[in-house]
């Protein structure tokens, strides 16, 4: 998902797992409609909070600012949700976490606290933490925008590997090369609406939207 700041990309992601409540329209997760209703004040709210909690476990989210628990080690961050939300036995959760930390290339830092990691390392821990819940889909909200330029590549490599495994991922990003090479579909938002939508080869080489052409040329220049 591409678009200028304020175009609605992050809001869209946050509506999928109801971190923000949509005011109109419908949200389906894996074909299942999230049921909504109006409360007594006329606000749109979930009809069944248990449904929302269940569906949230199917969506892993990786944030721009990592959102790791600072008082926990890397390993503790990764096992926290499986143990306390999914009731996975601790020894089983640790075994899976160790495997995931190897996968994202940060197993040697498993006993470190986040403050002692670089931004790229913290974001790879955040990806491992999201994967630990075995979600059907991963949501990435500008996962590299808070990183120093030299650290971006290590995170994109992990994300590319996940895409090659066939994982369903919705990625909000300004990394044009990554979007072009890795995605199966590109959506460009403008002022909350879809301005361009299609396969990357088509969108990047022959866009129908003049706004997207301007957006793309501006980012390629930088």
Language model region names:
Residues 25-40:
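Conserved ABC transporter NBD signature motif
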Residues 113-117, 121:
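Conserved ABC ATPase signature
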Residues 132-136:
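A short, proline-enriched helix->beta-strand linker immediately N-terminal to the Walker B motif
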Residues 138-141:
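Catalytic Walker B motif of ABC-type/P-loop ATPase nucleotide-binding domains
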Residues 197-198:
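ABC ATPase "signature
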